[in-house]
């Protein structure tokens, strides 16, 4: 029995699709059957050797092949440090372009996830560099960072695509908002700018007020945007939104689930939502 099937992994199982691609594809099919798309994420980060990066690249290429052959409706998310950024920027760019090329042939969008603050500039720069050639890619922006509104403005200016999230990483007060009200307000500022200046973007939030404002803004600006939520978090709300909106469920899988789970558990607001989701089933 795999560790993810053990009693101690009850909470992780709420978020994680499984430890292997087969289980992840099965879960993706189930989600697709509910008229929801998926953002599939093979878990991995902070890789310091080419050997580990190449192992992850093999998994990501298999993921794209399986999504195509099994007709999975959705996109994938990859982390820069999973695909070689710590080794070198040029190595990361080479791997990112390989992923984009294959994904483009399959009609699959690739999201660049955002990581620790020191990787933000290189992530955005690389995204904008390859966005010129590949239109099937977007980048994640964390509203808790004080710099994010300027990043959103820059990306929108280049017709890029943003997936706006609150952010799960811990940052000092010099670079990030600490009060949840400030994070909320910055999220709204970034979202308003996207509605005013961008054609395609995703609002990834479990917050009722943010979702309501986004739906009302669709009517105000005559736009159809995408919404995103985490697997196993407020699933009934996601299903309700999916009745009339483009809902995308973030679907992580793989053996490296610990860091991802710890980040989620470190957020009290997320933890309350997840505990409620587990109790309610």
Where are these regions (language model features)?
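Positively charged, amphipathic and often flexible ligand-engagement surfaces
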Residues: 1-281
């Amino acid at each position: 029995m795999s560790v993810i099937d053990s009693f101690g992994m009850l909470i992780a199982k709420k978020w994680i699709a499984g430890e292997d691609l087969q289980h992840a594809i099965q879960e993706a099919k189930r989600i697709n059957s509910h008229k929801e798309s998926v953002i599939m994420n093979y878990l991995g980060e902070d890789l310091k050797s080419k050997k580990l990066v190449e192992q992850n690249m093999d998994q990501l290429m298999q993921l794209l092949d399986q999504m195509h052959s099994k007709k999975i409706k959705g996109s994938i998310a990859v982390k820069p440090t999973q695909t070689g950024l710590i080794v070198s920027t040029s190595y990361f760019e080479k791997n990112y372009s390989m992923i984009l090329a294959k994904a483009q042939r399959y009609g699959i969008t690739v999201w660049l996830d955002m990581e620790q603050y020191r990787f933000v500039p290189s992530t955005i720069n690389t995204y904008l560099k390859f966005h010129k050639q590949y239109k099937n890619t977007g980048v994640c922006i964390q509203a808790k960072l004080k710099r994010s509104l300027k990043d959103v403005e820059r990306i929108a200016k280049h017709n890029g695509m943003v997936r706006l999230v609150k952010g799960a990483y811990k940052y000092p007060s010099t670079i990030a908002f600490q009060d949840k009200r400030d994070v909320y307000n910055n999220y709204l500022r970034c979202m308003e700018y996207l509605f005013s200046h961008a054609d395609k973007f995703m609002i990834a939030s479990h917050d009722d007020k943010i979702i309501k404002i986004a739906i009302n803004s669709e009517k105000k600006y005559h736009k159809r945007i995408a919404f995103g939520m985490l697997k196993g978090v407020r699933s009934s709300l996601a299903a309700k939104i999916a009745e009339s909106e483009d809902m995308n469920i973030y679907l992580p899988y793989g053996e490296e689930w610990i860091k991802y789970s710890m980040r989620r558990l470190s957020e009290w607001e997320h933890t309350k939502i997840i505990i409620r989701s587990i109790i309610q089933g």
